[in-house]
Amino acid sequence: MLADIEQIGRNPRTGGYRRDAWSSADMELREWFTHQAAKRGLTSHEDRNGNLWAWWGDPSVQGPGLVTGSHLDSVREGGAFDGPLGVASAFEAIDLLRGDGFQPDRPIAVACFTDEEGARFGVPCIGSRLLTGVLDPDRARSLRDEQGHSLDEVLTARGRQPGRLGRDDETLARVGVFVELHVEQGRALEAPVGVASAIWPHGRWRFDFRGTADHAGTTAFEDRDDPMLAYAHAVLAARTQAEAHGVRATFGKVRVEPNNANAIPSLVTAWLDARGPETEKVRALVTELAAGADVTEESWTPEVTFDEVLRTRVACVAGLDGHPAPILPTAAGHDAGILASAGVPTAMLFVRNPTGVSHAPGEFAEPRDCVSGVIALAAVLADLTGGGS
């Protein structure tokens, strides 16, 4: 199924993807999702926050269901598997169950959460954060992309109703359990399929380094107030201090004003991604780097530990050759973490990534491992929903 969408939002020069939320590529992917649901006779709809749902069964009659799926948006120049693998595998797992004549005792849904990556508006997992009430709807509406368009304006242009954004208890009540399949984003998984134990705490911060614009040639060094130097020191310190604290820190995005080759900048704005196994160490790192800059926390996701009973059960069901699937933590953020923090029983399946490359065109998973992921997911869905042939 991934072949159906492999050209949507793809850069023909690099092979990477640009699938920003609510872009033309995203709208095309939404149509693909709805079409896949209709092909299978699933009842699909878009909730008030832009998340997509496709139901096998009726949760309003049968009670809360088991939801699987992921997201379809990407980071800039992202890979083909991060997100779409989970959505495609969810549809294929349903196909596998139906092919075996399986009839679940509770509803099953495929979900596609909007703007998981946060590439356009700067906040990750916007759809699931709004759904669960973690993200204030007024703040969400005011978020702006690089062109200055607010989320409110973008949603209105797409025919949505931004005034309806916010916690959606009606939709949440339909979700009894959530199981997200995702490509592993490192090299820690040696088996074809694994299970997540926890998600590291992580956040994004905007650093504003201020200076004074001036001529690059005529301004003596002793007369300069150059914010680029402060930024450069922060980049080096981020690496040094992160290693000392045992965490990860990355300045991956930067904006310079006025951005002239022959002028000292007046402002350097950079975005820091920091994450690690312990909250205190991540926050200590950010505090140490904050000297000389105005720092704004744009998002924060606390540590998530997945339900031990559920993850153990999932590992046993998803294992191959009679052995439980390996259980491992992840440093990557996911919608599964947002739902788990909101009290939804949640588990994650990982599909092996042989290179460990992610958020880049080189992201990859072997076809046979993807098949193993579908088989494992189908087994988990069958186990958690009961029913039979």
Residue spans of the language-model regions?
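His/Asp/Glu-rich mid-to-C-terminal helical/loop segments that flank catalytic regions of hydrolases
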Residues: H215, T219-A244, V351-S389
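Zn-dependent metallopeptidase/amidohydrolase metal-coordination segment
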Residues: D4-E6, G69-S70, A325-I375, A379, ...
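Active-site-adjacent substrate-binding region
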Residues: Q7-I8, H149-S197, V235-R239, W300-R352
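A generic, well-ordered mixed alpha/beta core segment in the N-terminal half of proteins
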Residues: R76-Q147
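N-terminal capping segment at the start of a domain
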Residues: M1-S23, T114, A140, E297, ...
